[in-house]
Amino acid sequence: MPDYQPRAMVQESYGFLSYGRNPESPESYEPPDELLVRFRGRLSRHLRELTDLRAGIDAVYLDKEIPVGSAWKDVLKDRLARCQVLVPALSPRLFSSKWCALEWECFERRQQLQRDRGTFIRDAIVPVLWAPLRPDEIPPPYSEVQYTHRDFHADYQRLGLLGLYSLGRHTTANGIAFQLAQTIARVAVMARLEPCDPGLFDDLFDSMNGSAGEEHDA
């Protein structure tokens, strides 16, 4: 009997969760983006269950975890250079965010490197329908990547994950989170997007000087 050699998975974060940050609201006692943080936790748990990702590596990276006082731009560039799949949470705030546009462009540069090397297989982008959106409300480039799935619950497309969670449809929302984790893991294996030198993004970050207060205030 031949020896079985298990196939090792890439030991990098599977998802970079790109989202339009909500501002603090004096009318609410809940932290902004609390539902998104919960979704990220559920998605991370499923990705750990579906893969052999080692402890100590974030399954899904969220920029809320950048330590206060750190060189946050360097942290963000490093994550954008290493995470395997971009996971944009589609919403009006994401579409109007300069930082989310930068995060998309960083992943596109990594993909272009693989195109130039002749090793590009497919996009390493898995959008999440976060807010309830009509197709005509989703602008390019987000509209150019598949964001709906025939085998997902029909109410996902009608309400988005935000609507499902807000209406107490937790069983449906958690099922969608599991299916999205499956999709992200599959895309990571298929795309095999290679890490790059974070310096590839220096000019993009330099162009954002003076914009830190928009969303990134670490």
What do the predicted segments below correspond to?
Residues 2-7, 61-116, 174:
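TIR-domain catalytic/interaction hotspot
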Residues 45-59, 109-123:
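Short mixed-charge
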